[in-house]
Curated annotation (Swiss-Prot):
Belongs to the nucleoporin Nup84/Nup107 family. It is found in: Cytoplasm; Nucleus membrane; Nucleus, Nuclear pore complex. Functions as a component of the nuclear pore complex (NPC). NPC components, collectively referred to as nucleoporins (NUPs), can play the role of both NPC structural components and of docking or interaction partners for transiently associated nuclear transport factors. Active directional transport is assured by both, a Phe-Gly (FG) repeat affinity gradient for these transport factors across the NPC and a transport cofactor concentration gradient across the nuclear envelope. GO terms for biological process: mRNA export from nucleus; poly(A)+ mRNA export from nucleus; post-transcriptional tethering of RNA polymerase II gene DNA at nuclear periphery; protein import into nucleus; ribosomal subunit export from nucleus. GO terms for cellular component: cytosol; mitotic nuclear bridge midzone membrane domain; nuclear membrane; nuclear periphery; nuclear pore; nuclear pore outer ring; nucleus. The lineage of its organism: Eukaryota, Fungi, Dikarya, Ascomycota, Taphrinomycotina. Keywords: Cytoplasm, Membrane, mRNA transport, Nuclear pore complex, Nucleus, Protein transport, Translocation, Transport. InterPro entries: Nup84/Nup107. This is Nucleoporin nup107. Component of the npc107-120 complex which consists of nup85, nup107, nup120, nup131, nup132 and seh1. Interacts with nup120, nup131 and nup132. The keyword Membrane applies.
Length: 813
């Protein structure tokens, strides 16, 4: 399964918001900064006005960067791995430790899939459980303190020499660990019907043949053995009765599987129960000789075979006999360390890998024992099938096996992971996963995405965590890449509560960058509250991350400078907000949640400037609804020290933007009411209830518009001088404020004129014109700069024409 880009659908139900009160900025032209020390500033008045407005709700949906919604479903194992890691990270190798808990969880999943007969997941969980078992075994040795070496003497038994060999050779000890791991992870042996009487049918055939007939076999000839010696069939080159021959094949298949799985006692018991007592005795000859009288540190009795190498040579000779069953040859081959005879019956990667390791470990041990206890005259050379074998060569041979099933299994990502763990080259497979992730991130499909599927990302991430907890070196660039991909995966599946645990394992260079980009994806109120608690639990600086998140999204979205005024198209408040702007607003709320008031003021103003400069009135209004006025409450209690000047300036600028959004919302509501066709139904007259209700609403909307527009104009809305800002103080900011002012003051003038005109209040239209033309506020400059002076003059002309017909007009007589 190839890995996809983990973009997510971000659905967020916004908080209630408050709009500003109808009371306008009557006193806004007063120098706000100059009145702070009097204890009651215009800022406080603006906040109080804001809190009187009715509450409203709005649902917002944001989607991923490509405007696509991608959902990833993950099982409960992701939560369980998270919990296990959190609880057991200080206890790695014990029976109640981290790695064993991983292993047990995988075993539980494996058993469940067996019941559900889910073949794909049966294989995955089986391989994963084996992987954690392998890590537990290998790393408990690699990270353990080296104990004192076992020392032998001239008369030590071969069993002691074997222990000495492993105690002095860490590489050999690791190979033996892997061999035991492969042995313990074998498949269950096939079942077999137990017969207590060996060669029963052949025995009866021989009896009947000697008596001159047989009721058990209809075809007695000289091809059947004539006696029941254990090696009669081989020695005489004759066969058994077909039924006994079939049973022998089943027996050797089961016997080999029992030896393969390390069930040596069960193998001996099988021999005894099937009448193969001689075979049980001969198999015990494979045990190394141990003498408790010489090896006084050992408590066991004398046991084993002094001439084990002779038995193994006999076994090797039997592997060359093609007349005997392949599983019998494989059993003898496994006993002596021969490779080819065992490989002949191996059809799985695990079995073939065990065969290689069996041959390699036996050969290396034999070479050591021969060097420690040479018997020049009688010593037989070791079986050399394992000569030159190393783990790397073994896995390379398996990858290029002539058996298709073995070669296919060798390419499985979890088996590749196991081979890298065994060869202590975990960094290489982590690097391969990183390369695949980079290909996906850059839009190039990797040749293989097998290492970055959700299950593999989970496994690799927790291996990285284990390595870091263990104090082992991990390439930071590679590990960061994989952990970040896993974080993206969890976020895609809405498992955001799991993410903070993994954030803390990122390197210092990217930790808060990743944390901040993750916070961008967390948009639900409950999830954000939970993130605050998790940040405290894992000692993460969520304030810093939230600020970085806002900076990232702002830099991403605000990529162009404001256009010239005459090229700007003002969007309606009701138009849908672009997803990228939604994301910016949603991210800005993190500063509110983390109570970073100063930064909230700064960035809210930056975002307002951007939106209003490019005509995104709908986006500006959306921002207005998501940053409530009570976010500024801390300002009302601030002292009047000079260092707070910039804070009050930011707050006053923000209140200007909020007042504009509120006023234009009033105007939009007024327009909707004024366009309603209340007289379409002839039954609706001026005396009707419907008309009266509509008229009342319209008059109220008109009053709100007049009040709010008038207050904004009289307050010299957003003029830099009201912020005590001069052109030389900050030329770019000064220019930006003037650009926005020149864009929206004409909207206020024309909108207010329209309301007066609809009310047939022509005197107010002309009074407004006088204010516009006044040199006090120089509002006419905004009309000139915006190129809308001619438009306004034409409106006045219409008002003049209509005023002539009024009772007080020129032609009223």
């Amino acid at each position: 399964m190839a890995c996809c880009c983990y973009s997510t659908i971000l659905t967020h139900t916004r908080l209630d918001f408050k709009t500003m009160h109808q009371n306008a900025l009557n006193n806004a032209t007063l120098n706000v900064l100059g009145h702070k020390k009097n204890g009651s500033s215009s800022i406080q008045e603006l906040i109080e006005m804001d809190e009187e407005e009715a509450e409203m709700n709005q649902n917002v949906v944001c989607i991923g960067p490509n405007e696509t919604a991608v959902s990833v479903e993950l099982g409960d194992e992701y939560e369980k791995f998270n919990i296990i890691t959190s609880l057991k990270k200080d206890n790695l190798f014990s029976k109640d430790g981290l790695l064993y808990a991983y292993y047990e969880l995988c075993q539980e999943k494996f058993e469940k899939c067996l019941k559900e007969d889910d073949e794909e997941w049966i294989e995955l969980w089986d391989l994963e459980s084996r992987t954690w078992d392998l890590i537990q075994r290998l790393y408990s040795f690699r990270l353990s303190e080296q104990q004192g070496h076992i020392q032998s003497h001239a008369f030590s038994s071969r069993a002691v020499l074997e222990e000495e060999y492993y105690s002095q050779n860490p590489e050999a000890f690791e190979n033996n660990i892997v061999f035991n791991w492969a042995r313990d992870n074998s498949s269950d042996p096939p079942s077999i019907e137990i017969r207590g009487n060996r060669w029963f049918y052949t025995r009866e055939d021989i009896k009947m043949k000697n008596r001159g007939g047989s009721r058990f076999s209809s075809n007695i000839s000289g091809t059947i053995v004539s006696n029941l010696d254990p090696d009669a069939d081989i020695r005489d080159d004759k066969r058994l009765d077909e039924r006994d021959d079939n049973f022998e094949r089943q027996f050797f298949h089961t016997a080999f599987c029992l030896f393969r799985s390390g069930s040596f006692e069960e193998l001996l018991e099988l021999c005894r129960r099937t009448g193969n007592h001689w075979r049980s005795a001969s198999l015990q000859g494979i045990l190394e000789y141990r003498d408790n009288l010489i090896d006084d540190v050992l408590q066991s009795e004398t046991s084993g075979n002094k001439r084990k190498e002779l038995l193994r040579r006999s076994c090797l000779a039997l592997t060359k006999n093609k007349r005997i069953d392949s599983y019998e040859r494989a059993l003898y081959g496994a006993l002596c360390g021969d490779l080819n005879s065992v490989l002949d019956v191996c059809t799985t990667w695990e079995d073939a890998m065990w065969a290689y390791y069996n041959s390699m470990t036996q050969y290396n041990l034999d070479v050591y024992l021969s060097s420690k206890a040479p018997q020049t005259e009688t010593q037989l050379p070791p079986v050399d099938s394992g000569l030159g074998l190393t783990p790397e060569l073994i896995f390379n041979s398996l990858s290029n096996s002539s058996i298709a099933s073995i070669q296919e299994e060798a390419s499985h990502p979890l088996i590749k992971l196991q081979t890298h763990i065994i060869c202590n080259k975990i960094s290489e497979i982590l690097s391969s996963a990183h390369i695949q992730l980079e290909a996906i991130r850059t839009g190039n499909a990797p040749e293989s995405g097998d290492l970055v599927t959700p299950p593999l990302l989970r496994i690799l991430t927790h291996i990285i965590l284990f390595l870091k907890i263990s104090g082992l070196a991990v390439d930071e660039y590679t590990s960061d890449s994989i952990i970040q991909a896993y974080i993206e995966l969890l976020a895609s599946a809405k498992k955001v509560n799991l993410v903070p645990l993994y954030i803390q394992y990122l390197s210092n260079q990217v930790q808060y960058e990743a944390y901040s980009r993750f916070l961008i994806l967390v948009d639900e109120e409950s999830a954000r509250s939970e993130q605050l608690q998790l940040a405290k639990k894992y000692s993460l600086d969520i304030n810093h991350a939230a600020l970085l998140a806002v900076e990232y999204v702002y830099d991403e979205v605000v990529s162009v400078s404001p256009e010239e005024v005459h090229t700007v198209y003002l969007k309606s408040i009701e138009e849908p907000v672009e997803p990228s702007y939604k994301k910016l607003i949603c991210t800005l709320e993190w500063l509110l949640i983390t109570s970073q008031t100063d930064e909230l003021l700064r960035f809210a103003n930056l975002v307002y400037r951007f939106f209003l400069s490019i005509g995104e009135l709908n986006s500006a209004y959306d921002l207005y609804t998501h940053i409530p006025s009570d976010a500024l409450n801390t300002l009302s209690s601030s002292d009047g020290e000079p260092e707070n000047d910039s804070k009050f300036r930011d707050a006053y600028e923000l209140m200007n933007y909020r007042a504009l959004c509120r006023a234009l919302k009033f105007y939009q509501e007024w327009e909707e009411l004024s366009k309603q066709e209340v007289f379409e139904d002839s039954a609706v007259t001026k005396a009707s209830t419907s008309y009266k209700v509509w008229k009342k609403k319209l008059n109220f909307a008109s009053r709100k518009c007049v009040k709010s527009f008038t207050d904004l104009l009289q307050a010299n809305w957003l003029h830099p001088s009201t912020l005590e800002l001069k052109p030389d103080d900050d030329p770019l900011l000064y220019k930006t404020l003037m650009t926005i002012r020149n864009l929206y003051v004409p909207e206020l003038i024309l909108g207010l004129h329209n309301v007066y005109f609809s009310l047939e209040d022509y005197d107010s239209c002309f009074a407004l014109a006088n204010e516009v033309a006044s040199e006090d506020l120089k509002l006419y400059h905004c009309l000139i700069k915006s190129g809308r002076l001619v438009e306004y003059v034409s409106y006045l002309g219409k008002a003049g024409e209509c005023s002539l017909s009024t009772p007080n007009g020129l032609f009223s007589l």
